[in-house]
Amino acid sequence: MPRELTEIKEFLLTARRKDAKSVKIKKNPENTKFKVRCSRFLYTLVITDREKAEKLKQSLPPGLQVKEVK
Protein backbone atom coordinates (compact mmCIF):
# COMPACT_ATOMS: atom_id res chain seq x y z
CA MET A 1 0.00 0.00 0.00
CA PRO A 2 1.32 3.48 -0.79
CA ARG A 3 1.88 6.37 1.60
CA GLU A 4 3.06 9.86 0.69
CA LEU A 5 5.54 11.70 2.90
CA THR A 6 5.89 15.46 2.81
CA GLU A 7 8.99 16.14 4.94
CA ILE A 8 12.56 15.21 4.00
CA LYS A 9 13.44 14.42 7.64
CA GLU A 10 10.49 12.06 7.89
CA PHE A 11 11.63 10.29 4.70
CA LEU A 12 15.19 9.88 6.01
CA LEU A 13 13.91 8.40 9.28
CA THR A 14 11.77 5.96 7.29
CA ALA A 15 14.73 5.00 5.08
CA ARG A 16 16.84 4.24 8.17
CA ARG A 17 14.28 1.81 9.58
CA LYS A 18 15.13 -1.87 9.93
CA ASP A 19 12.40 -3.04 7.54
CA ALA A 20 13.41 -0.65 4.70
CA LYS A 21 14.55 -2.81 1.77
CA SER A 22 15.25 -0.57 -1.23
CA VAL A 23 14.92 2.92 -2.67
CA LYS A 24 13.82 3.77 -6.22
CA ILE A 25 14.54 7.22 -7.63
CA LYS A 26 12.34 8.37 -10.52
CA LYS A 27 13.42 11.53 -12.32
CA ASN A 28 10.93 13.55 -14.37
CA PRO A 29 11.59 16.89 -16.08
CA GLU A 30 9.70 18.80 -13.35
CA ASN A 31 10.23 16.67 -10.20
CA THR A 32 12.07 13.77 -8.58
CA LYS A 33 10.31 10.97 -6.70
CA PHE A 34 11.97 8.91 -3.99
CA LYS A 35 10.21 5.64 -3.17
CA VAL A 36 11.34 3.55 -0.19
CA ARG A 37 9.99 0.00 0.16
CA CYS A 38 9.27 -1.10 3.72
CA SER A 39 7.57 -4.28 4.86
CA ARG A 40 4.03 -2.87 4.90
CA PHE A 41 4.00 0.35 2.88
CA LEU A 42 5.73 1.96 -0.10
CA TYR A 43 6.58 5.49 1.05
CA THR A 44 6.91 8.22 -1.60
CA LEU A 45 8.49 11.67 -1.35
CA VAL A 46 8.17 14.15 -4.25
CA ILE A 47 10.79 16.92 -4.55
CA THR A 48 10.64 19.66 -7.18
CA ASP A 49 14.07 21.18 -6.41
CA ARG A 50 16.93 19.35 -8.19
CA GLU A 51 19.62 20.49 -5.72
CA LYS A 52 17.66 19.17 -2.75
CA ALA A 53 17.10 15.89 -4.60
CA GLU A 54 20.85 15.47 -5.16
CA LYS A 55 21.59 16.21 -1.48
CA LEU A 56 18.95 13.70 -0.41
CA LYS A 57 20.42 11.09 -2.75
CA GLN A 58 23.84 11.58 -1.12
CA SER A 59 22.42 11.28 2.41
CA LEU A 60 20.61 7.96 1.92
CA PRO A 61 21.81 5.15 4.22
CA PRO A 62 24.67 3.13 2.67
CA GLY A 63 23.08 -0.29 3.34
CA LEU A 64 20.04 0.32 1.16
CA GLN A 65 19.78 -0.88 -2.42
CA VAL A 66 19.32 2.22 -4.62
CA LYS A 67 17.87 1.93 -8.12
CA GLU A 68 17.47 4.86 -10.50
CA VAL A 69 14.57 4.74 -12.96
CA LYS A 70 14.39 7.33 -15.72
From Swiss-Prot:
Q: Which gene name does the record give?
A: RpL38
Q: Which organism is it from?
A: Timarcha balearica
Q: Which GO terms describe its molecular function?
A: structural constituent of ribosome
Protein name according to UniProt: Large ribosomal subunit protein eL38
Arranged from A to Z, the UniProt key words for this protein are: Ribonucleoprotein, Ribosomal protein
- Source lineage: Eukaryota, Metazoa, Ecdysozoa, Arthropoda, Hexapoda
Keyword set includes Ligase: no
Pfam families referenced in this protein's UniProt entry, alphabetically: Ribosomal_L38e
The record's Gene Ontology cellular component field reads: cytosolic large ribosomal subunit
PANTHER family in UniProt? 60S RIBOSOMAL PROTEIN L38, LARGE RIBOSOMAL SUBUNIT PROTEIN EL38
Stated family: Belongs to the eukaryotic ribosomal protein eL38 family.
Tell me a GO biological process for this protein.
Answer: protein-RNA complex assembly
